[in-house]
Structures are given as C-alpha cells and as structure tokens.
Amino acid sequence: MSAGEGWCVATVPFLETDQQLGRCVALIGTDSGRYPYGNSLMVSGPEETVLIDPSLAIAERGGAPRHIDRMLISHAHEDHTAGVSTFPHASVHSHHDDLLALHSLEGYLQVYGMPEEMAAEWGPKVVEEFNYAPRLDATGFADGHTFDLGGGQRVEVVHLPGHTRGHSGFLIEPDGVFFVADVDLSAFGPYYGDHWSDLEDFERAIERCRTIDAKHYVTFHHKGIVHGRQDFLTQLDAFAAVISKREQRLLAYLSEPRTVEEMISHRIVYRPNVEMLFVTHVERVSINHHLRRMCRVGSVVELESGTYRAA
C-alpha cells in the first residue's frame, strides 16, 4: 500500500477481481458483491476520479486504487454508503430525494420507515457494522445531471426510483458503461420493502433501463458485469418477472379470506427459513404495495379492514 499525497486517503493495490472497462474499473466485492458487500465503480478522467457506491469491501480494503475526488451514491441504503467514511476529504453526492440520509442517522432511518423498536435496533447496526457517519456537506443531484471528469469523460445521472425515492443509475461515456445499482438482476428480484419504496415506480425504472443502450451493465450485487445489451435485457426480463410471480403467489393464497398478518407470515418475498431483523417489515410493506394494486384493478377485494380475498 502506498501513501497518498497531501490530504489524500492512502491508495491500495488493484486486486485480481477488479475489472477494467475503458476508464472505469469495477471493484468487485466479496462473493461477487453479495450482501452485505457490493460492487463499486471507479471512473477516472484527466481532471478527477469518482467512486460510485463505496461498499463495505472498499472500507475493508482501506481505500481505492486511485485517489478519489468525489463519491456518487446511488441511493441511501447501508451497503451502498459503508465506505463513505473511508474518504473524508472527497465530496459526496446523492439524488436530492435521498440526501437527508447522508446528513443524519435520523434521516437514514426515515428512508427505511421501520417501526420505532426495530429502528432503535437497526440504527446502531448501520453505524457499527456499516460505518455510518453523517456528511453534512453532502449535496444533491437530479436526473440528467452530468459530472464532467475532463477529456470527454462524463458520468450522467439516470433517476431510477422505486427501490428508494432517489435511487439512481449512472451512465458513463464514452465507455458505454451503465451502473444500474440495485436493479441488480438477482434471482431474489426487485426490492421495494421500505417506506420510501414504490412498486410501480420500480416497474417504470425497469422499463427505463431497457431504453439505455450500453456496452457494459454493472450491478451493485450478484451479477457484477453484464456484457452486451441483449444479455442484459434477457436478465432484466427474468428480474422483472419476479414481481408478477409474487403477485400470483399472493393471489393464490387469497383463495380464502386472509388477514395482512397471515399474509406476512405466509411470505411472498423471503423464504420461510430466512430470519433477519427487517423481514417482517419488508414483507408488510411489499404485500401492501401489491394489495393496493390488486384492489385497484379488482383482482382482490377487502372484506373488512385488514382482511382480503381474491375476487
């Protein structure tokens, strides 16, 4: 490891798992970026270098292979900001809608929208296990904003809400790299289980991803790098199909009257053996997203407050 110059954070060696994509380097996290780790993207131009989504793996490496001038955060979730405190002198930016989470822990917890008792337990975990520290100097960006790194190298914000209100991807040109963040193409499927999530916004975000023509697509989790538009679209179709599969499972379960609590215990998002602090919260939020839509289109009816059945 070599020391950085001036106030720079120390630079660290490249790893064999790091993958070069033009002037971009995908810094692949532990176990292909499986949660709680993730795949960060470093983009260098003649004038500055930015790091997109500094992950827990970056924090454990103790820095990045180049001096980082700026950090771009796709959205306010603990695994995407775990390396922010590693670069205290780099500026940090997120979409305006998620910016409050970078300013305070209270703002961070507001994005999740957990019940008070759960938030009291989750908050310390975000600090202790994901290195959270407020960045009052963090500033916001909007859809279409472009960060100019010099020499024609640029990073454009692509707002992809649904996962959170501010969730954004980044299109890097002229390399043709599209960082899609948590449109992660995983078998788990789309996550819309927080207070600031929205199922139908997520579906629209998926459709917007289809319109972006790139050479390489980088996910924060699991897949890492997908080369070529056709392969990306095939995997995106499978990812999106998980939403309808969840809805069909829920509809089948509602062949007889069920309460929301029964649906939560039955689960449509997590497998029955998964035990994590936030599972019940995620199931509740996700199921309510589906119920609202199913009631609106008439496939489900509410018999009495909190009890539903397939129409």
Q: Where do the language-model regions lie?
A:
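Metallo-beta-lactamase
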Residues: 49, 146, 154-242, 260
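A structural signal for the main folded, soluble domain(s) of proteins
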Residues: 5, 17-18, 43, 47, ...
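Short Gly/Pro-enriched turn/cap motifs at secondary-structure boundaries
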Residues: 31-33, 136-138, 159-161
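Active-site HxH/HxHxD metal-binding segment of metal-dependent hydrolases
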Residues: 36-37, 56-148
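Divalent metal-coordination and catalytic microenvironments
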Residues: 43, 53, 75, 95, ...
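C-terminal regulatory/interaction regions
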Residues: 5, 249-311
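Conserved beta-strand hairpin/beta-sheet module of binuclear metal-dependent hydrolase folds
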Residues: 11-63, 169-186
